[in-house]
Amino acid sequence: QKPDPSGTAQDIGYAKAKSIALNHAGVSENEAYDMEIELDDEDGTLVYEVEFKSSGMEYSYEINAATGAILKHEAEID
């Protein structure tokens, strides 16, 4: 079963996860490419894994699906 992209009370949704990652990285949506978002279970906690590239950098985020908190993030030269 696919989660609702707009989210629920327990799930912020794909669009919000993407927006949190882009805002944190300081990248606008039209500057990002190769965007990948997936919902994953990390030891019983649902997290969105968000990855994208922009301006020669590769960004990777883990975002708590219930709270929107950034659990882990990396930026490296692509």
Where are these regions (language model features)?
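Long, terminal "pre-/pro-" and other extracytoplasmic accessory regions
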Residues: 1-78
